[in-house]
Amino acid sequence: MSNSLPVPMSLNEYLAHLPMSDEQRAELAGCTTFAELHERLSAQPVTDPAEAAQASVGRRLTLTTADQLEDAEMLGVDASGRLCLKATPPIRRTKVVPEPWRTNILVRGWRRLTGKGNPPKPEHDDLPRDLPKARWRTVGSIRRYILLILMLGQTIVAGWYMKGILPYQGWSLVSLDEITRQTFVQTALQVMPYALQTSILLLFGILFCWVSAGFWTALMGFLELLTGRDKYRISGASAGNEPIEKGARTALVMPICNEDVPRVFAGLRATFESVAATGDLDRFDFFVLSDTNETDIAVAEQQAWLDVCRETKGFGKIFYRRRRRRVKRKSGNLDDFCRRWGGDYRYMVVLDADSVMSGECLTSLVRLMEATPDAGIIQTAPRASGMDTLYARMQQFATRVYGPLFTAGLHFWQLGESHYWGHNAIIRMKPFIEHCALAPLPGKGAFAGAILSHDFVEAALMRRAGWGVWIAYDLPGSYEELPPNLLDELKRDRRWCHGNLMNFRLFLVKGMHPVHRAVFLTGVMSYLSAPLWFFFLVLSTALLAVNTLMEPTYFLEPRQLYPLWPQWHPEKAVALFSTTIVLLFLPKLLSVILIWAKGAKGFGGKFKVTVSMLLEMLFSVLLAPVRMLFHTRFVLAAFLGWAATWNSPQRDDDSTPWIEAVKRHGPQTLLGACWALLVFWLNPSFLWWLAPIVVSLMLSIPVSVISSRTNLGVKARDEKFFLIPEEFEPPQELISTDRYTYENRWHALKQGFIRAVVDPRQNALACALATSRHRQAQPIEVVRMERVDQALKVGPAKLGNQERLMLLSDPVALGRLHERVWSEGHEEWLAAWRASIEADPHAPLLPLQPEGKASEPVPV
């Protein structure tokens, strides 16, 4: 529907949404057409009325920010003379060439035989070979051999105990001659108990070795933190107060994709202001690298970027770019940054969408890089904070209390051949560009294509090139947030599971350091241990059924004088069970002991932290079987080729509805009940051993829902349960993040795309930031006209997201659509725009709105 409004009336409404004085509005109110209005706003003649809105973009954009934009030289023109906003620095391209993967060892061997296996090194290869071999490399190798001996020795002893517990003691009494003379059914019945036992014993050995690795890691971390005598810690390489060299420029890059915009830019602003407080802001630039494909969120990002630059005077320091082609997801986003601007910086700090880092932490990372010339990556240990649901608070408490032990333990065993977790870390740009670009995995299927979990692979490539990868486990000032509930965590786990399984294809790639081969293996075991545990339990139940339902064979050989009795040693079972419990829960007890020794005030005191630990242990016991079944499903889905979506995890407090919980956990509850009934029917006494599993599954629905409640989390915090030091005495960066998040939500942009089309100021910003700036060409003009006509024909409600993205990226099409909506009076668009303003209780007060519409936020 068009032409529903007389031009003067709609023109007055248009002027009311421009930040002008009454005199300026009165002067422009005499215009008879919108083309004339835009011509007078632009103060230059307009030959084509269809381009009138495009001509006035500069004036509409700079009505309130002219001084700041001009001082920072943010305004420019493209090749066609259209105004654009310099949201990114000038491009200085650097070559980024990924090396193709050769994952097939047979093909690699053939290439070596034919003389094609060793391609020439690139000329720019500048590995730090002139540096002396650091002593830590030898020490790290010795430590890892010790760890391997401890793990295997512990596993062998436990396996021996497990073998003694099982009722059938080995295969020695199974006669091959007897088997060959029996029917297949008789052979199967005779061999089945032994086959089940052997499978159980094998799975037990793998799982116990996995638990043992975690135990020794936590134990060494405990000793490191208790004594404080770690001469190889990377944070000791710098005195901490050296001036940062002028050439040591660092880019803070934040890749985002359909994220919570108020929270993202609140954390960015808090980090920016913290860096500014150090006096070293001139050494840092900030980049928001968006892969967002939801147009409403994309427009909100544009406005949030403009607001944070205006409020912090960050024009020319805080940059924003949204990619139109989302190639290789997050790693491709970083590749694009390195290709366009990476050559301008010596270092890069990667931030996640929920990351917050203090200025002291960031400047310390730069100093550590300067003091350690062979370090390629230094990873901080982010501390979780900022969430209020009961589930998130327990996870925050667990990572804050137990996490330091495991992180310090990882450093003890790995030293400079450690992990990189993809964010809150500093990276040396030159070797990263030259060696860490990721080619897609060859082949077809679920484990081919773009690498999903890029961080472990980039660390492995950095180490393969001769650079160290360190964890600065004792460096404060690095923060992140956790998913608010179990289901959101599991969504994230599905992506991580698929990514880690893909990475294992690189296990035998030439040149990888053994430590990073082990990292690929542990990444797989993080999720593969779930189906192994599940199959272990299933086989144990099957063995119980065999022992209960099948008549035991006491005489296996002819003329056997004495029967072969199945053996049962309950004392060994209790001893092995107790040992396993110690390995699982002793690290948590050691964590609390360490807090007692160092000071428990920030955790609510000794009593509260101990009770919190016990409650968290109970909660982890309830959730372990639930995670086991979900992870088993994820592993099977990956191997079967079911697609894993890459939606961003929920980063705000969010309760799980009962319907959603029943949908997700209902099959688990049913499985737990049926499993319990089966075991009770077979042998009621065995149900006590299986009770922690089946009871947890049957309680999964209420546990998932209740733990996601914010009110319970807040009440626990008020009672000082699950308290962490970042809540007891919050750092300024987190205080600022909370305050800015609240303020940003108060003024958050709703219905962003409709605003970008209709609103005079929002349209100017969207046109100035649009990146599809083609030169004049007839085919392009035809496509633009078709897109604008289609948008006007179907209206905002029926316009698809892909069509919206095309319009948002094209400044000419967006300007023409804006001009025609107003000049032709397309009521469907105008009504949607007015409704979006009416639905926003905190919209700026405008002359045509009733008094009392807007009010100022009251920070909490």
From Swiss-Prot:
Protein location: Cell inner membrane
Domain of life: Bacteria
Keywords attached to this entry: Cell inner membrane, Cell membrane, Glycosyltransferase, Membrane, Transferase, Transmembrane, Transmembrane helix
Membrane-protein topology: Multi-pass membrane protein
InterPro entries given in the database record: Glucans_biosynth_gluTrFase_H (IPR023725), Glyco_trans_2-like (IPR001173), Glycosyltr_2/OpgH_subfam (IPR050321), Nucleotide-diphossugar_trans (IPR029044)
GO biological process, one term: glucan biosynthetic process
Listed GO MF terms: hexosyltransferase activity
UniProt entry tagged with the keyword Transmembrane helix: yes
Enzyme class name: transferase
UniProt KW Isomerase keyword: no
Function, in words: Involved in the biosynthesis of osmoregulated periplasmic glucans (OPGs).
Protein name: Glucans biosynthesis glucosyltransferase H
Species of the source: Pseudomonas syringae pv. syringae (strain B728a)
Lineage, uppermost ranks: Bacteria, Pseudomonadati, Pseudomonadota, Gammaproteobacteria, Pseudomonadales
